[in-house]
Curated annotation (Swiss-Prot):
SMART domains: RhoGAP (SM00324). Residues 36-56, 327-337 have a biased composition (Polar residues). InterPro entries: Rho-GAP (IPR050729), Rho_GTPase_activation_prot (IPR008936), RhoGAP_dom (IPR000198). Signal peptide: none annotated. The keyword Transit peptide does not apply. GO terms for biological process: chemotaxis to cAMP; small GTPase-mediated signal transduction; sorocarp development. GO terms for molecular function: GTPase activator activity. Coiled coil: none annotated. It is found in: Cytoplasm. This is Rho GTPase-activating protein gacH. It comes from Dictyostelium discoideum (Social amoeba).
Amino acid sequence: MSGVGGESVHLRRSSTTATTTGSSKSSLNISKSVSPTGNKAVSPMSSPNSLQSGATPTIAQLQSLLKQQQQPNHSITTNNNNNKSVSVEIDDLKSQLQHSNINDTFNEDEEIEEVTDEVIINHDYHSSEDEYEDDEDEDENNNSVNNNSNNNSNNNNNNNTSISSAHSCESIAEEEELTASPILSRQYSYTIGHGTKPDVVLSIGGGFHSSPRSNRSESTIVHEDDLTNQNDKVINAKDKISSDYKRMMEDPEAFRNEKLKQRKSKFFTKKDLEEIPFNPSSGTQLRSTLFQQFMNEKIQMISENPEKYKSELMKFYKQNLKPQVPKSPQSSGSLSTHSDKLKTSSSLQRSRSVSQPPVVTGNSKNAIGSLDTILEKERKRDGNQDRQLPILFTKCVDFLSNDEALKTEGLFRVAGNSSEVEDLMKSILLYGSDIPSNCCYHVVSNMLKKFLRQLSTPVFTFKYHNDFIQTMKLNNDEERIKAIKEILKLIPPVNQLLIKELMKFLVKVTSFSNVNMMHAHNLGLMFGPNMLKAPSDSEMNAISMLDAGNQVITLLIENYNLFYDN
């Protein structure tokens, strides 16, 4: 019977199953069945006064009335405490039954089951559900019960009323399972393989075994990836790092030796390390060659004339070990002159652009001599009187004339290693050494610029410095070319030949300007300040001198055929 909280009450007896639910109308559904032994149930006595219109009769009263309805006299006798009997006619009974809304139809398809005397309250049953589904094993028992009830209904006459139940109950085991486990809402979309516990178990062979559909959600996405393997790799890497760190903190020296041993044995065996030849860098080769030549020269001098070498060595020590006393200014005039020179040099350094190379004047302490002096020394040393250009210049031009060097981006602009430039320059000037084949192109190009910059007399000479500046003030290039031609005829022959060969080489460099990014103007910026210099710092205008030198070199490169048409 139905309670206030929407609960369903199932009354179970040995021969009858009744279920009532609360609704706007009081209704009663009774399913009559035959007991397993085939005997009819005994009806207890009930009071007819309780069967009034609108009242709900009890099951015992209704069974008693139906029992007496089947008797021949068609009357029902009720005994009370005062032993009074009341005879109720069958018509009155039918009218009372109609007012009680009793369904007197028997549905053969309804399921009738035999249960014990037990009342089960199902809190999880909802009125919106039509009925519970029965198991297959319960269907067999219900079929046997229905057959017995059909046989019983055939024996009875038309007055036999079959009462059915609209809601049949399930087995006790099923109801206990429903009441014990609450209804849990499942996740609609379940993604496997991204940090959640999957419903699909991945197998080793690459396939997967799905769990039952009831245990999964409506939409399950299976990602067959190797996240497990990746997580294992990460964990292993973390463990290795932590173990290495621990060993490093415990014994740093042993850890270092172990890593060095692994590094050496990773690529080469011990035998390979012994057989691999040593390939020093170009700078190392230059230093070793220079030192070897120096030692050979000293050994030769000692063997030829030991006394002379000893006297020269003592003279050298006396000069360098002699203390130098700073000279004090003799007068205020000399002091003012010295201060003016300092101001001029400082103003020049401030006005000089960072991107432009520094200007080295003829008073530089690093001067290596003029072209004539260098060429004369080389002729005596090598015994070649036909040499017309310094060997350093010819070696640099020959080394940079191949296509690979000419395609080097930033040639003459990118700086090279200063120590390698210095060592290579000394080796060539003193001993005429060759340039190593693996030498950097930027080292050689910077050495050529440094050679031109450290000449005691610049290539365009101090004497004609102002003349070159004045030619660049002319109106057009034709006049400038004509004036420069006349000036070039006045400078020494060695300088003329060097300018011609250098401009010829720079024209070749500009032919690869789309690769090396060195146009005529860029080359003018690199060589102008090194070849056109003022006689002294006090007599030069830095801006005009730099612009004039750049313009002269650019004009020579762009109009090489006009200058040297022969």
